[in-house]
Amino acid sequence: MLKKSDFHYDLPEELIAQGPLPERSASRLMLVPSAPEQFQDCYVRDLPELLQPGDLLVFNDTRVIPARLFGRKVSGGRVEVLIERFLGTHQAVVQLRTSRSLKVGNRILLDAGGHAEVLGRDGEFYLLSFDVESPLEQWLSDVGQLPLPPYIHREPDEYDRERYQTVFARAVGAVAAPTAGLHFDESLLARLRARGVEFGYITLHVGAGTFQPVRVALLQEHVMHSEWFKVGAELVEQVRSARARGGRVIAVGTTVVRSLESAMRHGELQPFVGETQIFIFPGYCIRSVDAMVTNFHLPESTLLMLVAAFAGRTRILDAYYHAVQQRYRFFSYGDAMLLFPRNAGEQ
């Protein structure tokens, strides 16, 4: 049985990117072909030369909301609120950071004005009702703070409002960015189109659960967080057309892989809207994509386990060792990989 510790690697703290590069597509890109071919050190801007006419790039078009709020309990204790998802115009599922748990009926006096009341609790999530001056989504866009990942040790600024968002973000609802998509700027997209590469989109609203660690030793005992996603009929037809013409389906990010795999029915991609708790780790066979662009992920994380299922655990850990030796930048604002699948029988 696979253990969490099977996905450990040593990462120097200074390789964790604390902010974006001035140019999105200037990030480095490690090409990881199927074994035994060697890794290649490239740049994201090289993608038009690495892809082929007829390939289909699939992006996640979710848009990050400024989902972080601050307030205090009636008793005076400080509270941090992180919106997980909206339920109507004035209710939301949230995570709370506070010295003591809140109970049903407790109020939070919000620094930005108004208050929220606890309606219920399910594990680490709370249901809050917000008494604020406008619909919650609109109000947050004015007063909320962008929820940068916990390994970025600084407060967000106005630059993050632009750069912790993809250039094609349109479907509001994520509390974390689909980070592989952050590398694509308009210039790179234009060059890819000129190359004959097509674009398709899914929506998966990345939740705060993406940062939750695996807390059990054996992977089979881990319960994955739930996220809302949509795979539309238009994308399904694009995938079928790409396959028919001999093109490759290339996922931009692990969220795209999770969405496509969750929408597979009897070996075929089907339109789907709903929740997914799919947990992909080695032993699972990913059939929906032929390659993937992805950032470098945290040790022992479910995202690292997903890419290991695709490219092979040994291959991925070797690639990460190479990335550390070559001083790649890691995590959300870091560099990327272009991964191809493991060979049959490869671990």
Swiss-Prot record:
Coiled coil spans: none
Subcellular location per the Swiss-Prot or TrEMBL entry: Cytoplasm
Keywords for this protein: Cytoplasm, Queuosine biosynthesis, S-adenosyl-L-methionine, Transferase
Highest taxon of source: Bacteria
Catalytic activity: 7-aminomethyl-7-carbaguanosine(34) in tRNA + S-adenosyl-L-methionine = epoxyqueuosine(34) in tRNA + adenine + L-methionine + 2 H(+)
GO molecular function: S-adenosylmethionine:tRNA ribosyltransferase-isomerase activity
EC class name: transferase
SUPFAM superfamilies named among the record's database cross-references: QueA-like
Function per UniProt: Transfers and isomerizes the ribose moiety from AdoMet to the 7-aminomethyl group of 7-deazaguanine (preQ1-tRNA) to give epoxyqueuosine (oQ-tRNA).
UniProt family annotation: Belongs to the QueA family.
Subunit structure: Monomer.
Protein name listed in UniProt: S-adenosylmethionine:tRNA ribosyltransferase-isomerase
Organism of provenance: Xylella fastidiosa (strain M12)
